[in-house]
Structures are given as structure tokens and as C-alpha cells.
């Protein structure tokens, strides 16, 4: 449970960083908004935890499925933001905007995530809000960031395989 609280702090730090996105980009992206969001978040997570995780395909799919299953077209979340699969030691959380709505990013906000200022804001927010120790980070075996675009908003979730503490 302690690890879940720490991971929730990580995700809330991400929400704070995502909330800082206000500038608009004017370039046409080569990747979809969802792919851009996934790339930016995995980079920011790695810098925050001082790791070098790849965006694990299985975990990315868990995150995408959570968004598809739990987030309505209006951004409202059904049955909570957290998905825990104790048998497979997987935890997934959808980035929240408030207590009942997922954080929906516009295409302009997603494009802004490429800016190094986003990564710096995320890292600073994460380090300020999280109390993950090196031992906690070492228990993370794989991470994945999944994003799904519904209508004009892109929703982001994080999934991780976590080795239980002994």
C-alpha cells in the first residue's frame, strides 16, 4: 500500500506538470497526439526517477486499456482512476484533473510536452511531491505510459509492474 501511495504521488506530480502546459505549438506533428504524450511522459518519468526504462509495450497496453475502459467521451471516469492487478503485480493510474474527471489534454498542450521546460517542470514537481526511495524505484520492473485520444482530448495513464517488498 505504501508503494501505491508513492506511485500516486508520482502521478499527481505529473498532473501538476501537465497543468503547467499553456503555450501553443504551431508545428504539424509527425506523430499522433497520443504518441507524443507517451514519448514525453516516459522521458519525464525516467528523468524524475533517474532511470532508463523503455515504454514497455505490455504496460503501455494496460494503460491504454484502462483509459478506454474507464474514461468516457466526456472525460468522466467510471470506477476510479486506479487499476490494480495483484496477481500480475501491475498498478495503473489514469492522470486525474479532479476527483471525477480524467485530465484531457488538447493537441496544443500535447505538442508543448516536447519542450524541455515540460520535462523540467515534471521532474521538479515529481521530486517535490514524491518520496520514492532508490529501493522503491528498484522494485519497479517495467513501466509504460499509454495515451488515448477521445474527441479533441488526449488522456494519459501510467502502468508499472512492481516487485513486492520482502
Whereabouts are the PLM-identified features?
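Short, well-ordered surface patches within globular domains
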Residues: 29-91, 95
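Bacterial signal peptide processing site
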Residues: 25-27
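Sec-dependent N-terminal signal peptides
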Residues: 8-16
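C-terminal motif of bacterial Sec signal peptides marking the signal peptidase cleavage site
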Residues: 19-23
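A well-ordered secondary-structure block
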Residues: 88-166
Amino acid at each position: 500500500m505504501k508503494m501505491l501511495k508513492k506511485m500516486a504521488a508520482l502521478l499527481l506530480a505529473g498532473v501538476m506538470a501537465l497543468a503547467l502546459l499553456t503555450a501553443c505549438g504551431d508545428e504539424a506533428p509527425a506523430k499522433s497526439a497520443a504518441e507524443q504524450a507517451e514519448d514525453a511522459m516516459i522521458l519525464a518519468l525516467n528523468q524524475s526517477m533517474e532511470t532508463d526504462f523503455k515504454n514497455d509495450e505490455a504496460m503501455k497496453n494496460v494503460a491504454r486499456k484502462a483509459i478506454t475502459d474507464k474514461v468516457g467521451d466526456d472525460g468522466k471516469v467510471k470506477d476510479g482512476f486506479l487499476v490494480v492487478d495483484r496477481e500480475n503485480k501491475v498498478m495503473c493510474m489514469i492522470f486525474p484533473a479532479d476527483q471525477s474527471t480524467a485530465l484531457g489534454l488538447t493537441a496544443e498542450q500535447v505538442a508543448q510536452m516536447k519542450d524541455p521546460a515540460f520535462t523540467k517542470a515534471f521532474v521538479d514537481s515529481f521530486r517535490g511531491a514524491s518520496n520514492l526511495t532508490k529501493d522503491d524505484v528498484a522494485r519497479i520492473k517495467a513501466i509504460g505510459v499509454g495515451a488515448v485520444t477521445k474527441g479533441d482530448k488526449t488522456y494519459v495513464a501510467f502502468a508499472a509492474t512492481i516487485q513486492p517488498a520482502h
